[in-house]
Amino acid sequence: MRFFNNKHKEKGLKAEEEACEFLKTLGFEIIERNFFSKFGEIDIIAFKKGVLHFIEVKSGENFDPIYAITPSKLQKIIQTIRYYLSQKDPNSDFCIDALIVKNGKFELLENITF
């Protein structure tokens, strides 16, 4: 188990808050933040044009944050999505996205599983 100090947690929360604001400018409706299950966590769940977007937010300054989304992390995200949909609407169209925050800039990578 990894432990993070408060500074790291605050930085992550700030990045997620800024990410939500950025997503809203792109027409996303934020449905939920930090959804937890026994399988893992989804940073942001958003809705746009009839599709649920499960968004993993990664930030970094000295490395490319996309590399923090490992196959193991992606598997946990998928299990958490399955749980979420089983509780809400199993027939929803969805995709998994990554929102990369680096040096104050945002890059949305849609459908990262394909």
Curated annotation (Swiss-Prot):
InterPro entries assigned: Restrct_endonuc-II-like, tRNA_endonuc-like_dom_sf, UPF0102_YraN-like
SUPFAM superfamilies in alphabetical order: Restriction endonuclease-like
GO molecular function ontology, one term from the record: nucleic acid binding
SS bonds (residue pairs): none
NCBIfam families: PRK12497.2-4
Family label: Belongs to the UPF0102 family.
The name this protein goes by in its record: UPF0102 protein Hac_0727
Upper taxonomic lineage: Bacteria, Pseudomonadati, Campylobacterota, Epsilonproteobacteria, Campylobacterales
